[in-house]
């Protein structure tokens, strides 16, 4: 392991974040810290994980949800200080690592089967 990887591992250990195991197809609730002026509050963002990028400290994931009939996608950095918590609501049974095809689908065709056990 080279120096950069070692530093990234130390930084991840220092952050001490508990991140649940989740994969594309899973429905997650991401609690985000939102600062509005002097007020600070938590905002829940619930949707389906359509992509996950594992790059150590630079890991990220994309969550897609339908908000008032319009598809909304948001990219989150996994180790961001803005993320308060990640909760897995249900596990999805998919055969792809990237679910970008869900962007073209709507309604019943965009449903994902639930993983049993």
From Swiss-Prot:
GO MF terms held by the record: structural constituent of ribosome
Q: Which InterPro entries match?
A: Ribosomal_bL19, Ribosomal_bL19_CS, Ribosomal_bL19_sf, Translation_prot_SH3-like_sf
Asked if Ribonucleoprotein is a keyword of the record, the answer is yes
Would you name any one GO CC term? Answer: cytosolic large ribosomal subunit
Tell me the superkingdom of the source: Bacteria
Query: Cross-referenced Gene3D superfamilies, in alphabetical order?
Result: 2.30.30.790
Q: PROSITE patterns recorded for this chain? A: RIBOSOMAL_L19 (PS01015)
Q: Which UniProt keywords apply?
A: Ribonucleoprotein, Ribosomal protein
Gene Ontology biological-process entries: translation
By sequence similarity, the record places it as follows: Belongs to the bacterial ribosomal protein bL19 family.
Q: What does this protein do?
A: This protein is located at the 30S-50S ribosomal subunit interface and may play a role in the structure and function of the aminoacyl-tRNA binding site.
Query: What is the name listed in the Swiss-Prot or TrEMBL entry for this protein?
Result: Large ribosomal subunit protein bL19
